[in-house]
Structures are given as structure tokens and as C-alpha cells.
Amino acid sequence: MTITANKRHYLEKVSHQGIISALAFDQRGALKQMMAAHQEGEATVTQIETLKVLVSEELTPYASSILLDPEYGLLATKVKANQTGLLLAYEKTGYDATTTSRLPDCLVEWSVKRLKAAGADAIKFLLYYDVDGDEQINLQKQAYIERIGSECTAEDIPFFLELLSYDERISDNNSAAYAKLKPHKVNGAMSVFSDKRFGVDVLKVEVPVNMAYVEGFTEGEVHYSQAEAIKAFQDQEAASHLPYIYLSAGVSAKLFQETLYFAAAAGAQFSGVLCGRATWAGSVPVYITKGEDEARKWLCTEGFQNIDELNRVLEETASPWTEKI
């Protein structure tokens, strides 16, 4: 794979020696739910913006880049560490739960040109995709991603595509039924969107198994032997020639770190992570119940510990994207 000099320059800005140790805080709907669990009533715009600022101030000195949204995160972009790169999200949050299609939608007041002008070093777009889903729906999704890829090509800025797999017939992605399908769903979507017509530079993906069902990682029911889980990671590596990074999917910091060791040992040559809740989730109840100062203390201690430990794991497990580009 070859990229332009400008795209390479931007990728260097969001990584450190070819490893992307990025902090994800573009959550909107999920963050509102987390906040609402600790107070009466919905989270306010000020609450959301302020927590994003706190996280950006305290944790970006230890991240190669931060992913924020332009809806609530623009103030946070102003206080990030100077050496830390910036990814901006282009999609609307959530999806229509009354249908199985989960069609994508851009933020209507934004374009790649505008996100770049707001300081983005890369553009991130999230797509829900069922590789076995309705053919017409998938054609619409593919056309949508082609348009975003073309925008990023025109602006000469890297395109990070986040793929979240699902099955149109299974509502619970954490179920045993979905766990059996997950390797095929995750790796199949990666293969589809690695085609050059989509203009994707980096894939942000799930690990291809639910680690809660992997032999040796659970005390409950097992749905993958160690050998089956290893093969799922090997198949993932074979599914794409593009650099790819892992999302944390809301699991604990400890499980995410253990997963990265397992992935690397299996032969997955991932180039880093975009890690969100595994790093900062514990700050939410502290912020809501005890205020800004206590949240800042949490970020400086436990938040720092989470990101520092993750960086150490990445040093041992991740492969530079420069090996693929």
C-alpha cells in the first residue's frame, strides 16, 4: 500500500514511531447514558464538554493522539498536548434501533474540509456492518464509505474507518449465539473495506472473538478453544493489507491489555489502539458525584495508570504501521 506524502505526514502526527496509542473520547450517546446513571436527569452540554476538556488536559500528554467529536469536543481540542495528534469523528452518534439496517449518517453541519480546518490530522467514521446482511443495505453502506473516502482523498487527509460488526437477526452482540459468528463477521467486514475504492488508510476494528468466551479467559461457558481464538486472530491479520488498530469496546483495562498480549502472540500485527472507556470510564462517576477537582485527581492517578500500562503493553505487542505502508 502506498499513500501520499501529506497523508504519511498526518499519520506520523497521530502516532509515535509508527504505533498509534490513541485516546478515544468521541463518545456522545454512551457518555450521556454513563452520566445519567449517576444523577437525576440528562447530562448537560456543559457537563459533557467539561469532562472532555479534563480528559484532554490530563491524559493527552501520554497519548500519541486523541479522538474527539466536533459536537462536544471542540473545546477539548484546544487544550490537548501540543505534540498529540487529533482525530475528529464525522458520524452522528448511535443508530436507529427500530430497524436492523443501522445505516450511517454524517454530522450534517460538517465535511472533511471543515473537520480539517478545525485541526483534524485524520478523519474517523464509524460504520455498523453485517457482512451477511441485506444486500441492498450493504450496497448503500459501501457507496456511503466511497463518498467519505473520496472526500478524504480530495483533502489529502487519512481516513480511519471504524467497523462494528453485528448480525441483523441477533440483538445482543455479547450473547453466545453472536460469539460463534463474530470471527467471520469482524474479519469479513475488514476484507470488504480493504478494497482501494473505499480510500481507507487505517481500519479501527474489534478483536475477532469475544474474550469472555475464550478458554483460559473465563470461568463460565467456553465457546472458543485457545486454538480457535488464535486462528481467529491469524485470519484477521490475513483479512486486510491495511494497518489496523483495536478499539477497547468498553471492556476493563486489564482485560484489554491481556487481549493485546494474546493477539500479538497469535500473530496479529495490529498497529496500536484507539482506547476509550477502558482508560477514562472511572472518571465519570467521580466527576458527576464529586466534581471537577476530584475527577482531575482520578485522571492524574488511575487514569494515568491505565494509559501508562497500556502504552507499556503496546511497546511489547504492536507493530508499526510503517511496515504496511
Curated annotation (Swiss-Prot):
Q: What is its EC number?
A: 4.1.2.40
Q: Could you tell me one molecular function GO term of this UniProt entry? A: tagatose-bisphosphate aldolase activity
List the coiled-coil residues. none
> Is Ubl conjugation given among the entry's keywords?
no
Per the UniProt entry, the disulfide pairs are: none
The record, for InterPro entries, names:
Aldolase_TIM (IPR013785), DeoC/FbaB/LacD_aldolase (IPR002915), LacD_aldolase (IPR050552), Tag_1.6-dipho_adolase (IPR005927)
Give the record's keywords alphabetically. Answer: Lactose metabolism, Lyase
Q: Which reaction does it catalyse?
A: D-tagatofuranose 1,6-bisphosphate = D-glyceraldehyde 3-phosphate + dihydroxyacetone phosphate
Look up the record and name the pathway of this protein: Carbohydrate metabolism; D-tagatose 6-phosphate degradation; D-glyceraldehyde 3-phosphate and glycerone phosphate from D-tagatose 6-phosphate: step 2/2
In the record, biological process GO terms are: 6-sulfoquinovose(1-) catabolic process; D-tagatose 6-phosphate catabolic process; lactose catabolic process via tagatose-6-phosphate
Q: Which family does it belong to?
A: Belongs to the aldolase LacD family.
Q: Which HAMAP family match?
A: LacD (MF_00734)
Protein name in UniProt: Tagatose 1,6-diphosphate aldolase 1
Q: Which gene encodes it?
A: lacD1
